[in-house]
Amino acid sequence: MKQVPVPIPLTCISCKLLEHILASNTMKQLESNNILFEFQHGFRENRFCESHVIFMIHLLTYNKDENIQTDLMIMNFAKDFDKVPHKRTVYKFKYYGMSQQAINYITSFLSNRTKTVILENTTSEKIPVTSGVPQGTALGPILFLIYINDLPQYIKNSQISLFADDSIIYRPIHTLTDCLKLQEYFEAAIQWEQDWLMAFHPDECNILRVTSKKKPGHFYYNIHGHMLQTVHSVKYLGITILSDLKWNKHHLKQTDPYHSFDEILK
């Protein structure tokens, strides 16, 4: 299995303590003032990966039972947490009304950061870090939530659900007009990524058509001129979603490792 190195933030104890205090107070302000997008399920109290999945499956099942086709696209950011520009993060912190004290701390927290690679007994030169929320920190996920919080505002009247950096844009399909509208949502999302220096990964963005119809409506969606592939199943947050919403493929994937283990024991 390919191993991807994970950066380790080096911060002193006092900094970590202040970070946790600021993270806690920031989330309280965001939640009490209803600043965060309603359907953002990541890194929030009483909202989890499970709540996001249940919400989507319930919605898709309802539409399917009503004989309504739902087209959806799962959008993945390329390098997600590593792409967030520091100066623009501070700007959004100000935009959402955080105190000047908190803004000063965030500015200091993100400024003058460097990274280095240690391999065995060799250490590389330090390189300045001007983007990316520090992973492994209490503030990192909150800064990311704040940064992508206005994505749904670009997609006016859209249907979008988020779990941190995983975005699902969807729409019930009745006529060709709905398909064209969904394509407009995708283009609005592209405008957001260009405005805020982020990037979606077109090769990992697929279209799933959830329907009970024998002859579902077809439309060729695209991002950056890249024709999106229509798939019959997609793995999302640990579950396998089929276009007919059956669970046999997910069940097989979950039980297959145990089956292989039994074969080894034999």
Question: Which role fits each region the language model picked out?
Answer:
Residues L22-Q40, P141-Y170:
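Active-site palm subdomain of RNA-directed nucleic acid polymerases
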Residues L10, S14-E19, H52, P85-H86, ...:
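Hydrophobic (often cysteine-bearing) scaffold residues that line and stabilize catalytic clefts
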Residues I21-T26, H52-K64, C179-W196, F261-E263:
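Inter-domain linker/hinge segments that demarcate the starts of reverse transcriptase
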Residues K79-Y96, S167-Q194, W247:
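Catalytic palm subdomain of template-directed nucleic-acid polymerases
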Residues M1-P134:
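Conserved pre-catalytic core of RNA-dependent polymerases
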Residues K156, H226-K266:
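Basic, alpha-helical interaction scaffolds
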Residues E184, A199-S233:
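Short, conserved micro-motifs composed of acidic
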